[in-house]
Amino acid sequence: MRFVTSARRVSALLFVAVLSACGSGDGSQQSSTSISTNDVSFSAASPDASTPPAQILTATIDPEAIYVAVLHNGAAIASVTYSLSGDTAQIVVDPASPGGLGAGVFTGTITVVGYRCADPACSRLVSGNSQIVNVVYQIPPVVRFVAPYVGVAATADTAVIRGQGFQKFTVEGVTFGATAATTFTVVSDTEIRASYPALTAGTYPVQIQASSSPGAITSLANMVVVNAPAYAATTLAYPSAAPQVQALRYDAERQALLLAVNGGQILRYAYAGAWGAPTTAAVGSLSDIALSTDGQQLLALAQTALTQIDPATLAAGTVTPAPALAADVFLKNLAVANDGNAVVTTGYNGSSNTQTYLYATRSPAFSQPATAPSMDNSTPGGSADGSSIVLAQGSPALASATGVYRYLAASQTFSVTGVSLNQNSIAPALDRAATRIVLNGTNVYDAGYNFLGTLPSTTLAVVVKPDATRAYTFDSAASQVLSFDLTASPAGGAFPQIGATAAGDPGTGVRMAISPDGGTLFLAGNNQIAVQPAPP
């Protein structure tokens, strides 16, 4: 219960005059208060909307009242203030922030009471009638993201839908455009898992149906369905010789390859019937790149800032400086989760534990959750559905193994996995749903981080097929792309090789990426880029 009180201040002589005018002041009459309305309603389009403007009420107070109390309670109300002029009180009601409340229907009450003297000496007060104002505040759910946001034409699959308010109102259906999900499960107030049927290429707004919602449900999520690419095997040259490739990403929506290379450059190779010459953008001290959860931004991580870049034009947008970092600490790598956050690791010139951060892509800012671990030059790798990000750390030079962590987007928490090892130069690789995880390019684990088997120690780079049935490696001994059956029982602890294909020699420092359908591999090293249909 919250109180706003005020007394009418009068001089002693005037007070006596008022009492004289009041008669005996015996309290036989109640103070009478009236108000302009007894019902106030607020609404916001979603929990992400701005706070609605305050509303103003007018109360008329009995002229003989000497004291006014305004009481309020309930989650709908942030504050109540009022000013008194003569017998009129102007009451200002400020609603709570939608972001603080979340989705739902929230209530509150405001009580206005005037008090008058109960006896001629005014030694005690008597209350008059109470005016009660009922406040109702309605906030519908919001759909923020779908992950992966790219689907493959003619292929049924499952997506993770993230938002807020999914358990505040009964969700009766999920649609991708005009097509209903085949099944869906409300996992939590912020997550729905939905299966969708085979769709044709196009863009499909993702929406939920909840008839009890107090208003239209805002959705910011679009599923982009693309045809599986049919790229011929080829190689692509760099604009400058022998770059060090720091990151390689495939933009399936726009049919483009995006690379971060040393010297602070982003390279973009677009496909339009054939691969074109690269366009470039400069980002000083560039260390990593990743597409945002919705694919609308390319996140370019430099050692001292993160810049949002248009993935089609490479035009620079919002720049967010790094949090306050200790001397010799820098922003190192990032991976994107389905909650709209990027997990950002930091590094140190040497061996030392440094902070891990989250970066919010739609309201650009860094934060450090309570569960975020301090790690030794950690490298993240994420699943395509953004549900899980794995963080390996350490160095082969360390005497003892270091713990592997993960970030679970569903709970927005970091935790240890139970696996300990020292990372090498190969980043963690995961399938679409994080059911198969490859660490150090050789060790394969299931979703519970149970060790399953190994890949060759000659692996230089690895990706996992989205459906988790294959691992594809670039092998230093064979100078080929090798394929391994992850559904088979490892013989002697090693997964069986079932295929191989000759790739154009990418050189050293190889990075790999895979198309969403699992049919095309991309390899980039210091020599060139190789585009290669995946072996069986």
Regions found by a protein language model. Give the residues of each.
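C-terminal motif of bacterial Sec signal peptides marking the signal peptidase cleavage site
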Residues: 18-21
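Beta-strand/beta-sandwich contexts
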Residues: 28, 35-61, 136-171, 214-245
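Immunoglobulin-like IPT/TIG beta-sandwich domains and homologous Ig-like subdomains
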Residues: 71-99, 103-105, 145-215, 267
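Repeated scaffold domains used in trafficking and secretory/extracellular systems
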Residues: 242-249, 285-291, 326-336, 371-386, ...
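Hydrophobic beta-strand positions that form the internal "hydrophobic ladder"
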Residues: 257, 298, 342-343, 389, ...
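Short glycine/acidic-enriched loop and turn motifs that connect beta-strands
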Residues: 263-266, 305-306, 348-353, 394-400, ...
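Blade-level signature of beta-propeller repeat domains, shared across WD40, Kelch, NHL, RCC1
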Residues: 506-536
